[in-house]
């Protein structure tokens, strides 16, 4: 009888790792649906694997699935769904786009932190095993990540923002890697390389003073004056998943903790046609 009990204990102990699940928080306050679809696909996949997912976003589920909890930010800002014409994006000036992103990042973060549902969530001080953020136009919510002292990774729903490379020590040579905000082709002319390099250097300054400093002051307001610089917190990002692929975006150097996952949000096609039977 003792042998049977010992055998059962050994089997249960050896298989316990199969039932381990993590509590994962996804902080996704950006209001554009086109950005959210990547995060949603990843979190739904993790929930399907048995992990306990909490999603903070403007897009709560219409058809809830198991292991996936929504904390809705609906009402904190106007959603950017069918609001921005594609021709405006295609013909817009780079500096106009950068200024718009800086403004939206600041306002979005401030409105999120002032939203009652977010205040209640922060006050609860719930603990997680992993936090997922978006690397886009503000690092303001890294103040919350730092206070939680939790490992975190980031998602980039587009090609990497120019200011994202430094935190990973990733090479970003402007002599042959085009800036995200400039519409240069893969093979840049000498003039385009010069413009690309000047814009690359100028954007470092713009990001520090127009994006980073205001976001840092805002983060200190909510997470304490002793908060270290957001740029230092950002360097602890363990992994970045980028929604690009070398077959479409051209090969470029990436350090090991930057991984291209282009098409992550795509689902297998549904077979809507009846099977064709041979006579």
Task: Locate predicted features.
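Conserved nucleotide-sugar donor-binding subdomain of glycosyltransferases
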Residues: 83-140, 187-231, 235-236
